[in-house]
Amino acid sequence: MKTQAEPTAQDFMHRDVHTVPSDMPLVDIVEFLLKHELSNVPVVQMDGDKPLLRGFVSEADCLEALASEMFYGMPIPPQTAETVMKKHPTCVSPETDIFALTSIFTSHRYRHVPVVNGQVLLGIVSRRDVLKALDEFYREWIRDRNREKFRVDLHKIVNHRFLVTQ
């Protein structure tokens, strides 16, 4: 039975990704997340026209940093993307298959994962993207299984015409 190839991150990643620079102040990051209705954002440093991934800032990171700032007072130096980001986020390559992505999302409870080639940010994959791709792959898998299961054996049909009964 021939099945389709497993989808990979490059098949359904978002290539047009909102990013922030590492020196962006915390209050501006919060405003950016709210304005664009994002739950997280990659922190990048530009190398010419290539965005190099430096880290990842989530809503939870901002909540923690803002609450700490309000409770304990203004930190010195002021908080920026550099100071609140996760410095070594879990990343995937464009070739990461759907089952590895599923494992990452179910094991770590992430909402989004950056897609990188080396340090260059290529895109981002969301949990919903993986669910949608897995659903499409599953439906195709079921169709393939049903085709194989109910495949008509043409030899039986052709040979049936020539059956000789005694």
Task: Show the residue positions of the predicted features.
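The conserved cystathionine-beta-synthase
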Residues: 20-38, 43-45, 91-109, 116
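Tandem CBS (Bateman) regulatory domains
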Residues: 1-15, 58-91, 97-106, 126-166
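Short N-terminal helix-initiation segments at or just after the protein's N-terminus
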Residues: 1-5, 21-35, 53-61
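A glycine-centered beta-loop-beta connector
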Residues: 33-36, 41-61, 105, 113-129
